[in-house]
A protein has these predicted regions:
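C-terminal transmembrane helical hairpin of 12-TM major facilitator-type secondary transporters
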Residues: 281-325
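Helix-breaking motifs and short loop linkers at transmembrane-helix boundaries and internal kinks
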Residues: 49, 81, 102-108, 246, ...
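Conserved MFS/SLC helix-loop-helix module at the cytosolic interface between two early adjacent transmembrane helices
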Residues: 68-104
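Helix-to-loop junctions at the C-terminal end of transmembrane segments
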Residues: 70-81, 267-278, 363
Length: 400
């Protein structure tokens, strides 16, 4: 498996366009800013004298920033050259995380987490358009997957590193590293992203015209429900691995890294096969696999290494659908491509929030952590149903 993934990564990524590397650095900074909070939450709570639930609002503030900033930034900046928008967004990454590192109290940090989330969805939206434009013929999904690979590397290495630094030094240093990474991304965007012209201005109303069709709504529903289903389980993967699967707390760092490896491998595989076959087929197959894996987790979570293997498979599915779904929304949002691609991130984050809430319900009723996988499987099945309706309603995409 590792040999297959390594060979596939080589075939996909080399020779790699420098512009895509610049985009990947940006998504790495965003991925670390979003997900490192799960690891440093206790340190922040102790430092600022707040409870864990209050500190948890820092995660919600970031997600709210994503949902608010994605459509707003794209609509305001729709007439600007794409490179200029990316530079402004990386500047916002630097500002939000640098100010978070210097926050004197909880409320300032809460506000800065909101600011840090503002560029997230817009960067993915603009970045997806740039990746599609610079991609070689027949390799559009691979180009988008290279951009997204930064997010997976953040989960594989960035989050464990940030968690370690928070414990060894201070959580402020972790946010400082994210700001520095944002500065590196800004420099690479400045040097390597070509001066692409702005997209044709279809006006404010024209940006929303694509939403009159059912196609983008079906894609967004597939994103929200599919990711929400996986996050029903993944939001509680750490206590599940310790209390149900029988791993030690000391093993969690390695377990999180293995989950990140699954994300990395899934992203590479998804981009490759979306170009080789079609994005629709990859989405359909991957969501079906994720549904079966979650059912397997429910029945097999007490078997230590089976639970670990199913975790890697499910996190691979989480990112295997990412670039195919981005490509599908670009194909179905002509005239509002940046808004469409940004809305994918909104749907992703809404799915995360919904999944974390629904997954917590069986735990709150005294059931075991493995029960989080049951509503997760149901949500993924609904996401796959939305994808199947899309495929049947718009078969021309399967035949292009």
């Amino acid at each position: 498996m590792c040999y297959f993934c390594s060979r596939l990564a080589v075939n996909v990524c080399f020779p790699m366009k420098k512009s895509l590397i610049a985009l990947a650095f940006g998504t790495l900074a965003l991925g670390m800013a979003e997900f490192v909070m799960m690891g440093i939450l206790p340190d922040i709570a102790r430092s600022l004298g707040v409870s864990i639930p209050e500190a948890g609002h820092l995660i919600s503030a970031y997600a709210l920033g994503v949902c608010f900033g994605a459509p707003l930034t794209v609509l305001v900046a729709r007439t600007r050259p794409l490179k200029h928008i990316l530079l402004a967004l990386t500047g916002l990454i630097i500002l939000g995380n640098a100010c978070a590192a210097l926050s004197p109290n909880y409320w300032t940090l809460l506000a800065m987490r909101f600011v840090s989330g503002l560029p997230h969805g817009a960067f993915f939206g603009v970045g997806a358009v740039v990746a599609e434009r610079v991609a070689d013929k027949g390799r559009r999904a691979e180009a988008v997957s290279i951009m997204v690979v930064g997010m997976t590397v953040a989960n594989l290495f960035g989050v464990p590193l940030g968690t370690y630094i928070s414990g060894a030094v201070t959580w402020r240093a972790t946010f400082g590293i994210v700001a520095v990474w944002g500065a590196v991304a800004m420099l690479l965007v400045k040097l390597w992203v070509p001066a692409l012209p702005a997209l044709p201005d279809t006006g404010m109303k024209g940006q929303f015209r694509f939403l009159k069709s059912a196609a983008p709504w079906l894609v967004l529903a597939s994103v929200m429900l599919g990711n929400g289903g996986i996050f029903c389980w993944y939001s509680y993967v750490s206590p599940l691995m310790v209390h149900t699967s029988g791993f030690r707390s000391e093993d969690l760092t390695l377990i999180v890294m293995l989950a990140g490896f699954g994300m990395f491998a899934g992203n590479i595989v998804g981009g490759h096969y979306a170009d080789r076959f079609t994005p629709e087929r990859v989405v359909r197959f991957t969501l079906g696999t994720a549904c079966l894996a979650l059912v397997g987790i429910f029945f097999g979570a007490h078997v230590r290494y089976l639970s670990l293997a199913l975790m890697c498979l499910t996190t691979a599915c989480l990112f295997c659908v990412s670039s195919p779904q981005q490509l599908l929304i670009l194909e179905n949002s002509r005239g509002g491509e940046m808004l469409g691609a940004a809305l994918v991130q909104v749907a992703f984050n809404l799915g995360n929030a919904l999944g974390a809430y629904v997954g917590g319900l069986p735990i709150g009723h005294g059931l075991g952590y493995e029960y989080t996988a049951l509503p997760g499987a149901a949500f993924v099945l609904l996401g796959m149903t939305a994808a199947m309706i899309y495929i049947r309603k718009y078969p021309r995409h399967e035949q292009r």
